[in-house]
Amino acid sequence: MKRTMFKSKIHRATVTHADLHYVGSVTVDLDLLDAANILPGEQVAIVDVTNGARLETYTIAGERGSGVIGINGPAAHLVHENDTVILITYAQMTHEEARAHEPRVVHVNQDNRVIQLGNDPAQGIIPGLLRPPFALNNPAL
């Protein structure tokens, strides 16, 4: 049996542009893709912190160091320039792989520059923001 597990995320990125008339996808700075272990063409879930919208699409590599997070195509109806988003990937793993897996969590600033790397999906970096109630720190599976 395979399990679908959280693989990586780019946390609280700022959308730099939204282009309704592009074919589709999300353009992401290659530095961010590398930091999060996300490949161009990989499926991602996008959660819009600003308005609560959720969608799935695939990544396109953006210029390295540009900070680009560009929403392309019909998703631009849901996610807009300057919205705060979380890009999430999942992977299918065996039970043994899941037990050994350490996800990649990439925290970015408002300019989409990496400010912290980690592997705890519940750990925030916003001052005063606590872990979710009852969230364990790296529990054994």
Swiss-Prot record:
Name used for this protein in its record:
Aspartate 1-decarboxylase 1
Query: Pyruvic acid (Ser) occurs at which residues?
Result: 25
* HAMAP family assigned: PanD (MF_00446)
Q: Does the keyword Lyase apply?
A: yes
Q: Which GO terms describe its cellular component?
A: cytosol
Any single biological process term in GO: pantothenate biosynthetic process
Which reactions appear under catalytic activity for this entry? L-aspartate + H(+) = beta-alanine + CO2
Q: Which residues form the active site?
A: 25, 58
Q: MF terms per GO, please?
A: aspartate 1-decarboxylase activity
Keywords in UniProt for this one?
Autocatalytic cleavage, Cytoplasm, Decarboxylase, Lyase, Pantothenate biosynthesis, Plasmid, Pyruvate, Schiff base, Zymogen
> Binding residues for substrate, per the UniProt record?
57, 73-75
The subunit field of the Swiss-Prot or TrEMBL record says:
Heterooctamer of four alpha and four beta subunits.
Query: Which cofactors are reported in the record for this sequence?
Result: pyruvate
UniProt remark on cofactor binding? Binds 1 pyruvoyl group covalently per subunit.
- Chief localization: cytoplasm
Species: Paenarthrobacter aurescens (strain TC1)
In the Enzyme Commission scheme, what number(s) does this protein have?
Answer: 4.1.1.11
Q: What is the lineage of its organism?
A: Bacteria, Bacillati, Actinomycetota, Actinomycetes, Micrococcales
> What this chain does, per the record?
Catalyzes the pyruvoyl-dependent decarboxylation of aspartate to produce beta-alanine.
Pathway it works in: Cofactor biosynthesis; (R)-pantothenate biosynthesis; beta-alanine from L-aspartate: step 1/1
Localization, per the record, is: Cytoplasm
Q: Say if the entry is tagged with keyword Cytoplasm.
A: yes
What is known about its processing and modification? Is synthesized initially as an inactive proenzyme, which is activated by self-cleavage at a specific serine bond to produce a beta-subunit with a hydroxyl group at its C-terminus and an alpha-subunit with a pyruvoyl group at its N-terminus.
